[in-house]
Amino acid sequence: MNGLKLRYLLADLEPVRGKVLDVGCGAGSVAKAVKRERPDLDVAACDVSRSALAIAAASPEGVVFRVAEAEKLPYSDGEFDAVWIFDVLEHVEKPELVLREVARVLRPGGRFHIVLPLEGQPWTLYRFIGCGTRWTAKRRHGGHIQVFSAERFSGLAAFCGLPVTATRWSYHFVLQVLDILYFTWLDWRGPVGGSVEDMAAERAGIAGSVMRAASMTVATLAWGEATLFADLPGGCGHFSCTRG
């Protein structure tokens, strides 16, 4: 799904010129991909994890990396023309503090793009099984301490000066089923120290080949499903916002 997330981000960044920021960049793969696709942009990125940033900074590829908390960004007011966040807000205690900081460092009219799991979205399997209440595997194994719906996020974003202007969707039926099965399996087995993709890449022999083939098949199905149903609500939102 990372390719789809990047595609939607780049579409949002198409009219943007100047300076952009990746908040919660991890090891920097998205920031570097944006810099490769848009070498005209000045790309900055930050994360709270020093170990992840050490990996990112080992080969920065033109991106300026910095250690920072999302709730307290070390940048000037209105410094950026666009900001994006992938899969971060569900992990923080006070998401409104993060959104206020994004609004602060964005110039008026600047673009904000966020990818956010919507495990409280009506008509999803997550909502049906009670994600975050009856079913808490993603809280324990994925650190998802917030459960969002599109309505909750849109209200919070508007309150913080970042009204939503467009929404795309992913994580429809296929990925919801697999996601729930995976975290339920973790509940039964215990932590495995990596994703399914990591395990498939590391496994040798026939078992590894089968896992890699299965992973590719699932990725293809998920991409097709998300592309076909991009305008129908799902378990993940790709929100475009504009700084008021």
Can you annotate each of these PLM segments?
Residues K72, E90, G155:
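Active-site micro-motifs of SAM-dependent methyltransferase domains
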Residues M1-S76, A82-F86, L99, W169, ...:
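Conserved N-terminal segment of class I S-adenosyl-L-methionine
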Residues M1-L4, S29, S59, E93-E101, ...:
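S-adenosyl-L-methionine-dependent methyltransferase catalytic module, highlighting the catalytic core
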Residues F86-L89, V115:
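Residues lining the SAM
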